[in-house]
């Protein structure tokens, strides 16, 4: 008998951590929008992480233009110095968010409570 289950789980971004990351990105001069937390986000490898622990999978724009991901135009934009700058600022924002999680008990608690609320019970039983 062959049994299968999804290789990648759907994503459950942890809104309290996403909001903290957004604030940290603003501190380094990068504006960003957060998606509606009621939306479905599709599956990916980070989904497998997000069903176990609070996680984020936010997006930063590398250009002011709307360019489809995984396209030749996106590859060209990713090779520009502006994209490198966004990557560096993104790393700064992630580091700041990690530090916030280490130092801020209320953020950790909010993340844990949110995670418990949004991840379906059938994942918790595995």
Q: Positions of the model-derived regions?
A:
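Metal-dependent amide/peptide-bond hydrolase catalytic core
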Residues: 1-126
């Amino acid at each position: 008998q062959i049994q299968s289950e999804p290789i990648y789980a759907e994503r459950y971004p942890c809104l309290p951590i996403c909001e903290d990351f957004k604030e940290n990105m603003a501190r380094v001069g990068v504006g960003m929008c957060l998606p509606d937390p009621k939306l479905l986000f599709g599956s990916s490898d980070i989904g497998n992480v997000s069903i176990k622990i609070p996680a984020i999978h936010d997006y930063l724009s590398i250009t002011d233009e709307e360019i489809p991901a995984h396209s030749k135009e996106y590859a060209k934009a990713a090779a520009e110095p502006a994209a490198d700058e966004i990557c560096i600022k993104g790393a700064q924002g992630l580091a700041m968010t990690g530090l916030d999680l280490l130092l801020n008990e209320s953020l950790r608690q909010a993340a844990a409570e949110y995670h418990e609320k949004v991840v379906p019970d059938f994942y918790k039983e595995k």
